[in-house]
Amino acid sequence: MCYSFAIAVTDNSMANVFWSNLFRNGDSELQVVTQLWRDTPLFADIPERHTEALCATMHLRDFKAGEVIFSQGDQGAGAILVLSGEVRVSADKAELAQLRDGDFFGEIALAASERRTADATATSASRLVYFLKQDLEEWIEHEPRLGARFLMNLSATLAQRLYAANQLIAKQL
């Protein structure tokens, strides 16, 4: 069963039921998640201690093979990192990407309150890390300079992905 992600993040009482933040100081899984995020372009030039502090606010979810993570049209609430497993991203039944450990997706939701543009399904047992927009906004309030750097990194990532999509469309015309 897949719960509505939008409900989980807009109602704090519901968030406690459906989402758990399992990280604690010194947790080795937190260190792994921190390193995986640091290996992405989103956290380029963000100091490790600040990345780790932000990662400590993130949420873990386990999915079974075949379980829907989100569907096209669902309200986006944040980006998702594949900690372990595999995720298929598709739109109109066409595969857009097959993601593995360390890959991230759904980052549009960090920048805009838009609906998901694709479907995401676990193709194997998967552990995912949710980086919610509301957590990013709180972090930016406390760390505005680093927040500006992060938003520049996010903008560059979105621009690169848009460019790649445009190139793919141009080849098909």
Enumerate the predicted regions with their spans.
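Cytosolic regulatory regions built on CNB/CRP/Popeye-like sensor folds
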Residues: M1-L173
